[in-house]
Amino acid sequence: MAAAVAGILRGGLPPRAAWLPTLQTVRHGSKAVTRHWRVMHFQRQKLMAITEYIPPKPAINPRCLPPPPKPPKEESGLVRLLRQDIVAVFRDNRMIAVCQNVALSAEDKLLLRHQLRKHKIFIKVFPSQVLKPFLENSKYRNLLPLFVGHNLLLVSEEPKVKEMVRVLKSVPFLPLLGGCVDDTILSRQGLVDYAKLPSLDQLQGQLVGGLTHLMAQTRYLLQHQPVQLTSLLDQYVKEQNEGDCATSANEKLHPPDPAPDA
């Protein structure tokens, strides 16, 4: 092959197509790998696990002591005062409504307070971090889902639901979320339905009218049979008297024949 290359370089003729060089390079394949990975014997695994090196833990510097325990946080006087106010509000009022405390102007807020105060309904605002712990430990815990964000309470000693709903309709941007009336938790729709009920005086009047009607009907039913029996007996006695009078009159008109002499 080297001679052919040298001849080409000297300008000679290229080798013939059938001519093969005397030296040829042959590329052999790689040798087979006989040491493939195999699963380690379980005894060797145990031995390796036992003899595994475990580095020691670094020593703790004695100056790196744990922090001292923090003293229990004492409640401030303001928190205790607010909790007392919350307890008094939920104890002394029969109606407690929850509304979302939206951003109202000073004029709108003053007008709303005035309209509610005419019906003896008052607005109370308490921080959530004081109000929520009280609700969690009281019978009003089901009101907790309503207290999201900033809220305000509409409270009244009497259940003035109808007046409250009428006032809130004039303030559509103050949403009503729910409330509690006479220890009964109601949703927003429940409060609206409660406001549609008639007043207590109307219900008492309807009850008295119904009872009076029932009493009159009962009295009529109790007296109807004796009166009818009395009228029938009077008619019977009258007919008997008329029959006796007719018999006596006939006897007078037609006296009996005298008995013949023997």
From Swiss-Prot:
Gene of this entry: Mrpl10
Residue range of the transit peptide in the UniProt record, numbered on this chain: 1-28
Family (UniProt): Belongs to the universal ribosomal protein uL10 family.
Protein name (database record): Large ribosomal subunit protein uL10m
Any single biological process term in GO: translation
Subcellular location as annotated: Mitochondrion
PANTHER family found in the cross-reference section: 39S RIBOSOMAL PROTEIN L10, MITOCHONDRIAL
Keyword Ion transport: no
Subunit structure: Component of the mitochondrial ribosome large subunit (39S) which comprises a 16S rRNA and about 50 distinct proteins.
